[in-house]
Amino acid sequence: MSTSLTTCEWKKVFYEKMEVAKPADSWELIIDPTLKPNELGPGWKQYLEQHASGRFHCSWCWHTWQSANVVILFHMHLDRAQRVGSVRMRVFKQLCYQCGTSRLDESSMLEENIEGLVDNLITSLREQCYDEDGGQYRIHVASRPDSGLHRSEFCEACQEGIVHWKPSEKLLEEDAAYTDASKKKGQAGFISSFFSFRWCLFWGTLCLVIVYLQFFRGRSGFL
């Protein structure tokens, strides 16, 4: 069975970020389409992402649609003694509401979306497997255009009993404030660098003018 591009991208991003987050431990990411919510073995932890943004493509009628309600289930386990961890992952599918086929279709995601989702996964992993403060989660539903209301009858996750939550206004405001603060910080850094460059350019030009005047003054005295 061929491996989809999205699956390869998930593994690539996960391994790169885990190498930075926990370089002393060895982690693996396994795609498991049979994963069930809340069915955990001893020592396993769960993280559920309910509002990922993805695009679906019907393999029967070629209809495409965008959804901001893609559900992704993660089960995580860390063997502290062996320093080996495992993440099992399932991306829930959706049915095409255009042609009504019973064939479930997989979603595709942009790399930037996958990176944000992996950041959330690592945040949960730090909290549940390492007892650390993982940091702030990113809320992907904010500013994600959707193709319409979520239709639970076409959603695999809804059919298996996963109830979608909606982030509160407070969480959305915090997420927007976090994004604005990051942008302002970047702009401030750019402005600071710009003025530092202009200041150095000014002093460099002034030094050249002084050297130039001294040189010609010396030549005038010699003549």
UniProtKB/Swiss-Prot annotation:
Tissue: Predominantly expressed in olfactory and vomeronasal organs, in mature olfactory sensory neurons.
Compartment(s) where it occurs, according to its Swiss-Prot or TrEMBL record: Cell membrane
Recorded topology in the membrane: Single-pass type III membrane protein
Residues that span the membrane, as ranges: 194-216
One Pfam family in the UniProt entry: Zn_ribbon_3CxxC
Biological process, per Gene Ontology: protein insertion into membrane
Record function comment: Specifically promotes functional cell surface expression of olfactory receptors, but not of other GPCRs.
Protein name (record): Receptor-transporting protein 2
